[in-house]
Amino acid sequence: MEFEHLLELIGDEPVFDSALLLAGDISPEYVRLQLSRWTKAGRIYQLRRGLYAVAPPYQKVKPHPFLAANRLRRASYVSAQSALAFYGLIPDTVNATVSVTAGRPERLQTPLGIFEFRHIKPELLKGYRMTGLRGQQALVALPEKALLDLVYLQPGGGRLEYLRELRLQNLDRLDLDVLRRQSAVFGTPKLRRAVDVITQLTRQEARDYEVL
């Protein structure tokens, strides 16, 4: 298989699975050998076993980190700091793309960046949607769920001090009714207290805006 044939096969896919190359009578050993050669030559990136992305200057589409995160762990969605920064709810640039999963926690360092997968209970895997990302798509937590996931995962995350440290902004983008409903799913006093604090911060931000 020539490299040009690989590019034709994957088309505009930002990330591809090695199984895509196994159609027909082609030998799996041959495919593995070719992928290894292209990786060593810097033509493709190996993200994890069986998962690859074409490297510049050959790539047609640069993979969005959120899409890559979804592909690295199928049963996951982007949440916490990464989703909050995406929605403009925190000003900080996040060094790693953070997702939640019912599987084991994991931190992966790849050519596309660092990806963290935090564990939550299976019954808490809700409150996310398919989100458009400049021609790509990925599962991303709703703004309210992203904040609740972070509070749940962070020791002391429900404290006023911690929530102030996040430098939350644009809180008018949060639906407080949705926040309360989703917090009930967690069923913990910590989340209930956090919602009260977030409501307080939202009202304070609104008052400060009126003064300006």
Residue ranges: model-predicted function:
Residues 27-28, 90, 189:
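Short coil/loop linkers at secondary-structure junctions
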Residues 46-55, 65-126:
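Short gly/ser-rich loop at a beta-strand->alpha-helix junction or flexible surface loop bordering the NTP-binding
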Residues 24, 41, 87, 166-169, ...:
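Residues at alpha-helix termini
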Residues 26, 88, 152-156:
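Hydrophobic/aromatic-lined pockets within catalytic cores
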Residues 128-212:
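Hydrophobic alpha-helical interaction segments
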Residues 1-75, 111:
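Short beta-edge/loop segments at beta->alpha junctions of small alpha/beta modules
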Residues 18, 80, 179:
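Generic structural marker for isolated residues within well-ordered, non-membrane alpha-helices
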Residues 21, 38, 83-84, 183:
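Hydrophobic alpha-helix position signal
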